[in-house]
């Protein structure tokens, strides 16, 4: 894993550590998540790109794109603070990631990108659709799968 990816992962962890137990559950993370777990996060060669939005050098939002076999997996999060929530930071960082995806789609093997959102996380579902992802599947009435291609 490159130094750049390690630094970005630490910035993602900084954001994720601000999440409540419920928000961690929305992302499929354990309640007691405290940082990078090499067995949980994608290996370095599976990371395609990480986009981070900053406020005065403080990481406040991320959009993470990893390889997941026949598709790419997308993850997004915003620092848990009224100062940053519902201010458009997530949409902005997702759009940066989608711009990169469209520009590099051929090099990525023309794989579609999936965004998984818990069915009880309407904010994530709404953001996925607002950013151009289309709902394609629902698994066990727990996860909605959104596709971008």
Label each region the model flagged:
Residues 1-22, 148-149:
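Conserved N-terminal entry element of GNAT/NAT acetyltransferase domains
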Residues 21-24, 28-73:
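Acetyl-CoA-dependent GNAT
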Residues 72, 103-119:
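Conserved GNAT acetyl-CoA-binding A-motif
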Residues 75-87, 118:
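A short, internal acetyl-CoA/4′-phosphopantetheine-binding micro-motif in the GNAT/acyltransferase core
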Residues 86-103, 126, 130:
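Conserved acetyl-CoA-binding loop-helix of GNAT-fold acetyltransferases
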Residues 98, 111, 133:
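Polar, enzyme-active/binding microenvironments
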Residues 116, 134-148:
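Conserved catalytic-core motifs of GNAT/GCN5-like acyltransferases
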Residues 118-137:
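Conserved active-site alpha-helix within GNAT-family acetyltransferase domains
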